[in-house]
Regions:
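Intrinsically disordered, low-complexity segments enriched in small/polar residues
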Residues: 10-31, 39-68, 72-147
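C-terminal motif of bacterial Sec signal peptides marking the signal peptidase cleavage site
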Residues: 5-8
Length: 147
């Protein structure tokens, strides 16, 4: 019985431990960089709440997946809330059928770098850069309504 249970364990060709099933995890690093002149408060539903990003700073969140790096779509599936300067401007964003600029739920609004760690662990870095154009777009949408 023990031989059957251990059959999936082992090392890869380089002698690195591959774990129980032989598949390494995948990692994603999500980075939201604030290059605007405004303080941003950000919430990603079911991930984190009300994290502040000051001008010139970044917020980093790491997510571990099974075999492949977690996707942006999976990470933000329940939406994201952005508030500028604790004021009325910002928004609650979701993925929709229509791709939108200044929506942090769409991959096309990110810089994406894919690589491998130690040659076999999938790694993906997702970077969204907030600029004053994000704030201007929020002002153009008008004040947020009470949720």
């Amino acid at each position: 019985m023990a031989a059957i249970m251990l059959a999936g364990c082992g090392d890869n060709e380089e002698g690195q431990d591959m774990g129980l099933h032989g598949d390494p995890p995948g990692y994603s690093l999500f980075i939201w960089s604030n290059e605007s002149d405004h303080r941003i408060t950000m919430t990603v539903t079911d991930r984190f709440e009300k994290k502040e990003i000051l001008p010139g700073e970044s917020l980093l969140q790491e997510e571990v997946g099974f075999v492949t790096p977690p996707s942006l779509e999976g990470y933000m599936i329940d939406g994201v809330s952005i508030v500028f300067d604790d004021g009325p401007y910002g928004g609650v964003f979701f993925r929709t059928d229509k791709v939108e600029a200044f929506n942090p739920c769409f991959e096309c609004n990110y810089t994406v770098e894919r690589s491998n760690i130690d040659g076999y662990i999938g790694f993906c870095r997702w970077t969204y850069t907030f600029t004053n154009a994000d704030y201007d777009a929020a002002v153009a949408r008008g004040p947020m309504k009470e949720q």
